[in-house]
Amino acid sequence: MNFKYIIAVSFFIASAYARTEEKDVQSLSQRDVLEEESLREIRGIGGVLLSAGKAALKGLAKVLAEKYANGKRTAEDHEVMKRLEAVMRDLDSLDHPEEASERQTRGFNQEEIANLFTKKEKRILGPVLGLVGNALGGLIKKIG
């Protein structure tokens, strides 16, 4: 009779242990599902905030671009416009990343190439003109 009690108690303990393990697995899977849902909600909220921020920045950039486009521009205003255009391109590339690279290669127009060339010219010609000026100044002093 003792043997039957030992087997019954052992069976009871084993079944109780199996039920607790099963409940632990279920609670872990439920916890995982809840965490996944909360992460989706957070991502959704982040996406909404990001799109609202992009829209606000685009609006601000357009307002500033219109302000600078209507009047006469100084060199500083021209640089501000270039920066605004770059910001607009960056914001557009966030919306459509595939089209951004195509737009950037098309946007590299003749004016930008000319600007790059004149900057390089100034870097090269500045020191050369300085040397020529010094040489001519030295010759004039020797002659005079």
From Swiss-Prot:
Expressed by the skin glands. InterPro entries: Bombinin (IPR007962). Keywords: Amidation, Amphibian defense peptide, Antibiotic, Antimicrobial, Cleavage on pair of basic residues, Cytolysis, Fungicide, Hemolysis, Secreted, Signal. GO terms for cellular component: extracellular region. The modification Asparagine amide is found at N70. One of its GO terms (biological process) is defense response to bacterium. This is Maximins 4/H3 type 3. It comes from Bombina maxima (Giant fire-bellied toad).
